[in-house]
Regions:
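Short, well-structured N-terminal submotif of metal-dependent ribonuclease cores
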Residues: 1-40, 55-69, 145-151, 156-176
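Short beta-strand segments at enzyme active-site cores
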Residues: 39-43, 123-124
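Acidic active-site catalytic centers that drive phospho-/nucleotidyl reactions
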Residues: 6-8, 47, 107, 126
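Active-site neighborhoods of divalent-metal-dependent phosphate/nucleic-acid chemistry enzymes
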Residues: 80-123, 157-166, 170-172
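Acidic, metal-binding active-site segment of PIN/NYN-like and related structure-specific nucleases
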Residues: 108-150
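Glycine/small-residue-rich phosphate/adenosyl-binding loop
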Residues: 44-45, 49, 53, 59-78, ...
Length: 177
């Protein structure tokens, strides 16, 4: 099953300021392209262009990519990956993510793509690694590749839904039967 990729993974492919993350991101994207296991939300492509063309103080005011190069890279992403676009379900789910999960609008929108489209994981360093949001688990590929994380929490076990169910009033008051 495919996983959703956040903007930061795409940007690190072109960011020389962190060679280790650059290598991890490039390999992740290369493998995802080869085995068709990565899906991009349209939001990641829009954010990719904005992030890579923004002037960087620590690069002497230069962007990571010249605008024309960033546009070509964005076109390549569109051609080579499955891209998800927002619809009413994604927007409704994103609103729920903001109100019930406390996510920022952009993070909620990203999560909503995965939740609505049944994608099990989001690959991102911007969420809490290993945390489950609804049916989606977040994986920080940079922590995993750096061996800073040894084990991910298991996905929700649906074999016995009663096991983790909080007690109801009915369970606490046997005389109500």
């Amino acid at each position: 099953m495919a996983n959703l990729v956040d903007t930061n993974v795409l940007v690190y492919c072109f960011d020389p300021r962190s060679p280790a993350k650059q290598a991890i991101a490039c390999e992740l994207v290369r493998q995802g392209l080869a085995n068709r296991q990565l899906v991009l939300p349209h939001q990641a492509i829009v954010e990719f262009v904005a992030a890579t063309t923004r002037p960087r103080f620590d690069l002497g005011g230069a962007p990571l990519l010249a605008p024309q190069v960033a546009y070509r890279e964005a076109e390549d992403l569109l051609r080579n990956f499955s891209v998800l676009y927002p619809d009413e379900d994604v927007l409704d789910t994103a609103l729920r993510g903001v109100s019930t999960l406390g996510l920022s609008w952009f993070d909620a929108h990203l999560w909503a793509y995965a939740e609505v489209h049944g994608l099990p994981e989001i690959l991102s360093e911007d969420f809490e690694h290993g945390r489950h949001y609804g049916h989606v688990r977040v994986v920080d590929p940079f922590l995993v590749a750096a061996n800073e994380i040894h084990e991910l929490p298991p996905m929700y076990d649906t074999a016995d839904p009663e096991q983790d169910r909080p007690p109801s009033n009915h369970d606490q008051n046997p005389s109500s039967r």
